[in-house]
Regions:
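N-terminal mitochondrial targeting presequence
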Residues: 1-28
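Feature captures the catalytic cores and cofactor-binding loops of soluble hydro-lyases/lyases
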Residues: 25-196, 209-283
Length: 283
């Protein structure tokens, strides 16, 4: 009697307050998709330069902390295809599409050479997969895999040849601890938000997510900064001295008459062709 009465009252409350209409209200998962041309440009830069570019724009943390290359020399560049894991629970295991219809295999099939599979784990030591599952990623020539969790069968995955970045490695299976639940939703890895279509770039220093909506501007800033840093480094090798004469600098605020501004002028970099000077910022 109590449960049926409570159910009726709850239903009435839902209808009267409009909760039913708002329950699934949300914004779009994707903010767009980075073009192949932009991916190539972003991939030509270091992750440090990209992080600096986002920092200059005032955007929040972009590095996926803890995601490290499984082997030296690995580098990944691609559009994010996301997969979210949730803690294991009997009803979730029952309700999740089974077999080949599972969200994880849906995500796999969306991947190719210009995509990076981004897998959000429930913990750094939980396994998101191993050699049998990831054989399919090898067959698809995936651009890379990134997770804030762990992977197993490390040697086999390295031999598959695709770039893999994870928090750690493990011998444990994952299904006992978590279940794949959603493909191409917004995910969070180590506190960094990733949307489907964002640019994912990984190298020896870590993995960075560049939001699709600002990818071109981030490239413009980061490329300009990296160019200046190379000039500064070259000058300090040629004329040894404290780096503080030229470095650090703030993009969009370099003064023409400063030591750095004068050095850049000798290399043909001026406010007319660079957005790094005072008054030239276009972001």
């Amino acid at each position: 009697m109590f449960s049926s009465t409570l159910a009726r009252r709850t239903a009435a409350l839902v209808q009267s307050t409009g909760i039913a209409k708002r329950a699934f209200a949300m914004g779009p998962s994707s903010g767009g998709a980075v073009s192949d041309e932009t991916l190539e440009k972003l991939g030509s830069l270091s992750t440090q330069a990209l992080v600096d570019g986002l920092w200059v724009m005032g955007w929040p943390a972009a590095q996926i902390d803890g995601a490290r290359p499984l082997a030296p020399g690995m580098k990944c560049v691609g559009r994010a295809v996301t997969l979210n894991f949730v803690p294991a629970r009997p009803d979730i295991a029952q309700d999740k599409p089974a077999g080949g219809e599972s969200p994880e295999y849906e995500a796999f099939e969306k991947c190719g050479p210009n995509e990076v599979l981004v897998m959000s784990s429930t913990g750094p030591w939980e396994s998101v997969g191993g050699d049998i599952k990831f054989l399919r990623l090898k067959q698809l020539s995936i651009g890379g895999l990134v997770t804030d969790g762990s992977v197993r069968d490390t040697d086999e995955i390295i031999n598959y040849g695709f770039p893999c970045f994870s928090y750690s490695t493990t011998a444990r299976q994952g299904p006992a601890a978590m279940q794949p639940w959603e493909c191409n939703g917004i995910v969070s890895l180590s506190g960094t938000v990733v949307r489907p279509g964002d640019a994912i770039i990984g190298d020896q220093d870590g993995v960075v997510c560049v939001p699709a909506k600002v990818a071109e501007m981030v490239y413009s800033i980061a490329h300009g900064r990296e160019e200046i840093e190379e000039i500064v480094k070259e000058e300090l090798i040629k004329n040894p001295g404290p780096p503080g004469k030229y470095y650090p600098f703030m993009s969009g605020k370099v003064k023409v008459d400063s030591p750095l501004g004068q050095l850049l002028a000798t290399k043909g970099i001026t406010p007319e062709n660079s957005n790094q000077f005072e008054g030239t910022a276009d972001w």
